[in-house]
Regions:
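Nucleotide-activated sugar donor-binding and catalytic core shared by glycosyltransferases
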Residues: 1-194
Length: 194
């Protein structure tokens, strides 16, 4: 049995699995390589989204209950930093319509990323709403700072390795118990603020 962390291996031993049958391999996401065309993809995204000269905050893998908190913070931050651009990526694509309604209710100008990729923006928006899978790595690389969701509520957080992999500073809420060891390592080296 190959485990990510020593505490997981200990759990298997507690269940009666013989120690020689257990190994600790670590998290394989740390070994992921960055695609060679990542910079080009980021440049294309920035151009299509009209955010080439913006300060970019990516709020990724957000859960129900987090977006309203993040949008409140965004409003306050934007008063101090008018060039701040929010890219909001709900964890589950089926929630995009609900998040879009929240954006309209709060009077934010928004656009779905899938539509921007079909026809680049002509006018800037307040929030870019990510509505398709497979886009986070280039968006993490494009961002100046990334919030990793599932951590403002007691969900346990999402994996913060991808933004750290591309050198983007990571912030999260207090509830990161699903990734305790990863978070501790990133906080210890100054790559993440919790």
């Amino acid at each position: 049995i190959s485990c990510q962390y020593p505490d997981h291996a200990q759990r298997f031993r507690a269940l009666g699995v013989a120690a020689p049958r257990i190994s600790v391999a670590g998290n394989l996401k740390f070994d992921r390589s960055v695609p060679v065309d990542l910079t080009q993809r980021c440049d294309e995204l920035a151009h299509a989204c009209l955010i080439e000269n913006q300060l970019i905050w990516l709020a990724a893998s957000t859960h129900d209950g987090e977006e309203s908190l993040l949008l409140d913070s965004f409003r306050r931050l934007r008063e101090q930093q008018p060039s701040l651009q929010l890219i909001l990526a709900p964890r589950h694509p089926h929630r995009v319509a609900d998040v879009e309604m929240l954006l309209k209710t709060l009077e934010y100008r928004s656009a779905r990323l899938s539509e921007i990729l079909k026809a680049p923006l002509q006018d800037s928006v307040d929030v870019i709403l990510v509505d398709q899978m497979g886009m986070l790595l280039p968006l993490y690389d494009l961002a100046d700072v990334a919030f990793v969701g599932g951590s403002l509520i007691e969900f346990g957080g999402q994996n913060p390795i991808e933004p750290a992999l591309v050198g983007t500073p990571v912030i999260s809420g207090p509830h990161c118990f699903n990734f305790t060891e990863v978070v501790e390592k990133l906080v210890a080296v100054g790559a993440m603020y919790q």
